[in-house]
Amino acid sequence: MSSLRHATEIATTRWPAAAEPRPAALNHLHQLEAESIAILREVAAEFRKPVMLYSIGKDSSVLLHLAMKAFHPAKPPFPLLHIDTTWKFRDMIAFRDQRARELGLELLVHVNPEGLAQKISPFTHGSALYTDVMKTQALRQALDAHGFDAAIGGARRDEEKSRAKERIFSHRSATHRWDPKNQRPELWHLYNTMLAPGESMRVFPLSNWTELDVWDYIQLERIPIVPLYFAARRPVVERDGALIMVDDERMPLRPGETPQWRSIRFRTLGCYPLTGATPSTASDLAAIIREMRTSRTSERQGRVIDRDSAASMERKKVEGYF
């Protein structure tokens, strides 16, 4: 495994010559942008100590760009928080550090110390336990340790059915639990931000965006993203119906497995052992957008953690997962 070289390097986003966005599409994106910026400003005005969760993916990149716009020329009045499972793609970590440094933002990184001490990994403990310990419990630890009362994230309603029924301002109990049967109405863009002692709020400014909206906005605003979203030849193994990229020497190969170099890209990014790639030749933004316009599958089809059970995402969210 040590002979497998690092397949990709941090690079600037590829900007091919592209047609100007249609006026209707441009107006739609501007409306989404205005709504998201208003939500970010509402969070800054209403909460004592907010934080923005930065998962390094395309949605987080758009959210970070919106936050920079919302408070320009000042910096966003909240830090970034990354929950590091220690199993993210190497390109993601390099990109995370690069963006925080370029923008001069405060970046908080938290790893669950108990999970680290127990050497919890997706290979030895399974995806369900690993996700609970290294993501859900780690997030709760970080929010409690810093006393954050609002956590902003880039989840969208079109991603997954449990997220589709969640409010933009999503109330959490003092133990960070979500009750899908007890949600607050959000009529006419009016949000109830009241919290009892110990409670908190999760806020989703991109709730009404679609995957295609995100890509159109990335192209329009020239937002830097992780190179893994672009197709390139990378080492993968086919495992349990998913193309898993061999990102470092820690990944144990099963009997008969040999990494093959294939042209792939990722529609969604997470921990590399639990994130399936998509065969693709879309190596620039225009090609990705063309691909998205004809896609009939969910971007989360490659997420192994979503296969735990039919209601796994909702259960995770009830327990405190973002």
Swiss-Prot record:
It catalyses: sulfate + ATP + H(+) = adenosine 5'-phosphosulfate + diphosphate. Keywords: ATP-binding, Nucleotide-binding, Nucleotidyltransferase, Transferase. Coiled coil: none annotated. Its EC number is 2.7.7.4. GO terms for molecular function: ATP binding; sulfate adenylyltransferase (ATP) activity. InterPro entries: PAPS_reduct_dom (IPR002500), Rossmann-like_a/b/a_fold (IPR014729), SO4_adenylTrfase_ssu (IPR011784), Sulfate_adenylyltrnsfr_sub2 (IPR050128). The keyword Acyltransferase does not apply. Pathway: Sulfur metabolism; hydrogen sulfide biosynthesis; sulfite from sulfate: step 1/3. GO terms for biological process: hydrogen sulfide biosynthetic process; sulfate assimilation. HAMAP family: Sulf_adenylyltr_sub2. With CysN forms the ATP sulfurylase (ATPS) that catalyzes the adenylation of sulfate producing adenosine 5'-phosphosulfate (APS) and diphosphate, the first enzymatic step in sulfur assimilation pathway. APS synthesis involves the formation of a high-energy phosphoric-sulfuric acid anhydride bond driven by GTP hydrolysis by CysN coupled to ATP hydrolysis by CysD. Belongs to the PAPS reductase family. CysD subfamily. NCBIfam families: CysD, PRK05253.1, PRK12563.1. Heterodimer composed of CysD, the smaller subunit, and CysN. This is Sulfate adenylyltransferase subunit 2. It comes from Bradyrhizobium sp. (strain BTAi1 / ATCC BAA-1182). The gene is cysD.
